[in-house]
């Protein structure tokens, strides 16, 4: 599942300043997850804020903790634009 993959990637990248954003179409829905390493959180990344930003593009919502948050949307159509918006958001930190 997405949480397992995100956790595994975060653990592999734990020495880096990294943010993982994953999503997948599943039975007409679009679940997504954000995981941030400790260094990214120290820099000011809040996974819940990233989920909110991404959620706007997939008609979704969600929340969580600074290091991991998840949500679900109803449309994958805007996912590509959502990933681009998240990238812009993170570059501005």
Residue ranges with predicted function:
Residues 1-93:
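Glycine-rich, acidic loop segments that terminate in or are immediately followed by a histidine
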